[in-house]
């Protein structure tokens, strides 16, 4: 019996981060955490592409642009922040963005991690950005690299 498992190493990996700018300081923390993790895990700066988009809704079309650009990425990390408000806008955006990211990952057979915070309030969002507890940008990059390594082995 063979068992396959990836390791979180950025050595020789080409990775992109697509990060939204809306909810700026929290989104910035996710992107910088993901980028720093890539470098700490042996990645080279010239093999990391960071693309900033206005909001989470723009992430899927930007992912598609990267996937069809002719550059071979081993993984992509999608970073953003959605905070629930008083209207249903949050629900529509969160549902559509998560569904499309998943579809693109399967369609292009490429690990695309969902490091998009969906939170009921700003305080909860900060908690998921590493202020108190886990850091979704860091864990998203680690998962992306682990999956990219696994895909190389399969």
UniProtKB/Swiss-Prot annotation:
Protein EC: 2.5.1.78
A Pfam family that the UniProt record links to this protein: DMRL_synthase
Active site feature: 89
Residues engaged in binding (2S)-2-hydroxy-3-oxobutyl phosphate: 86-87, 128
Broad class of enzyme this protein falls into: transferase
SUPFAM superfamilies with a match to the protein in the record: Lumazine synthase (SSF52121)
Keywords associated with the record: Riboflavin biosynthesis, Transferase
Binding site for 5-amino-6-(D-ribitylamino)uracil: 22, 56-58, 81-83, 114
GO function terms (MF aspect): 6,7-dimethyl-8-ribityllumazine synthase activity
GO CC terms in record: cytosol; riboflavin synthase complex
Pathway: Cofactor biosynthesis; riboflavin biosynthesis; riboflavin from 2-hydroxy-3-oxobutyl phosphate and 5-amino-6-(D-ribitylamino)uracil: step 1/2
Annotated HAMAP family: Lumazine_synth
PANTHER family in the record: 6,7-DIMETHYL-8-RIBITYLLUMAZINE SYNTHASE, 6,7-DIMETHYL-8-RIBITYLLUMAZINE SYNTHASE DMRL SYNTHASE LUMAZINE SYNTHASE
Family in the record: Belongs to the DMRL synthase family.
UniProt-recorded name of the protein: 6,7-dimethyl-8-ribityllumazine synthase
Lineage: Bacteria, Pseudomonadati, Chlamydiota, Chlamydiia, Chlamydiales
Gene that this polypeptide is encoded by: ribH
